Amino acid sequence: MAPRVLPLPRQQSFNPPTVLNPFVHPGRLSAGDKLRIALQGIILLPLRAICITFILLLAWLSASIATFCQPGRGFLPLEGWRRRMIQTTLSSLTRTAYFVMGFQVKVKGKVASLPEAPIFVAAPHSSFFDGIICALTGMPSIVSRAENLSTPVFGTILRSLQPVAVSRQDPDSRKNTVAEITKRALSKGQWPQILIFPEGTCTNRSCLITFKQGAFLPGVPVQPVLLRYPNKLDTVTWTWQGYSFKELCIMTLCQIFTRLEVEFLPVHVPTEEEKSDPILFANRVRQIMANALNVPITDHTFEDCRLMISAGQLTLPMEAGLVEFTKISKKLNLKWNHVREQLDTFAAIASASKGGRIGIEEFAEYLKLPISDVLKELFLLFDRNGDGTIDFREYVIGLSILCNPANTEETIRMAFKKSIPSYSMDIALQSVCLVFFQALQIPGIAHRAAEC
């Protein structure tokens, strides 16, 4: 008999994402690709490297002059000749650098002025080459890690853009970053426009993941900016699983040309409802961009990347840690640390299986119970798609729903209502309650076992 998928509360809202892993780019080169890159690189790589080094030094010199003896360094906006120098000289040098690297940039749409849109939101963010948008938009401010400002050469160039610095050591960094973005966006033209990649991390461009709220909290008009790399051979995508920074740089410099399309969509002016609800504002802008790109949206976030890395450290497949953290955390009121702890338990159960999934055998072995009808019904409470295995996402959802005192008994009764005769209902319920209490350490089940 085929396994039945038992209805659980809110089951449809926990459907798996359209794109299972947007943080991986396996990109394998064929033997022909490797040979072609090697032959082209003999000439292109050294020539381009020399030219880029020269351009980089000129950019550093321009940035140094523009920020020399800058009044109110970091606290006041650059004005007058300093700002014009950044907008003209540094912008031209950046465009030249991309031209030397072989980029053929096609621009669609019109760039909004500062009064029209204080903030640019660009997506999908998939590469360090996405920085071309800075040159196309007049060198706006960006959001960057504070550590980047202290790097040689690049740090000086970065400081000239007056970035909003984010410090991982400062516990108040997120709050301060949001406050600084809001202050600049509402400055009525005193500060330059701000460029933000709202996804917060790089993906493989197969979807748009959750947008962070920073760009939308000020409640000002934003201009969506789309990025496309329509190349037969992808040498630009920089994800958590894939080619390294160094490998991508070398492969791209060895290409004769690399196509890049940048499209500026119409400015999105928030409604009063969106101004008071930044999540709604972000989701609507994301949907507009996804429609224009013809890609789906998912609820993945940077926190999923952290779980993915943790899964790899636990010898699980890295994609096992992807749970769409935004959706899971909101609907089940879970914190990242709690989900991370559950990953350890899941890894212990799945260690005997292949592929990072729990089968009925591993489930029974971990619970120290024989495979029985009661255990199979319990297993089906977790196996939401009925494929005979439990992945980490199903494990977190199932355990969280069944641990909820508001619906624990209701869920168990629902699972057994149509499969166990009424005269054995009480025994079955008590057995399952005891299984949860003894093996899964679910709080509040002990006294319920006697009541079932």
Which residues does each PLM region occupy?
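Catalytic core of membrane glycerolipid acyltransferases/transacylases, capturing the structured
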Residues: 60-93, 98-104, 113-171
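Primarily EF-hand calcium-binding motifs
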Residues: 327-366, 372-400, 409-424, 429, ...
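Beta-strand cores of modular interaction/reader domains in eukaryotic scaffold and signaling proteins
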Residues: 44, 51, 104-106, 120-122, ...
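Eukaryotic intrinsically disordered and solvent-exposed regulatory patches
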Residues: 37, 105-109, 114-117, 126-130, ...
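Extended, low-complexity, polar regulatory segments
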Residues: 1-32, 306, 449
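Membrane-interface recognition of transmembrane alpha-helix starts
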Residues: 25-59
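Conserved, structured regulatory domains from eukaryotic proteins
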Residues: 85-89, 95, 145-186, 193-195, ...
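A cross-family acyltransferase "interaction/gating" segment
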Residues: 152-161, 190-193, 200, 204-280, ...
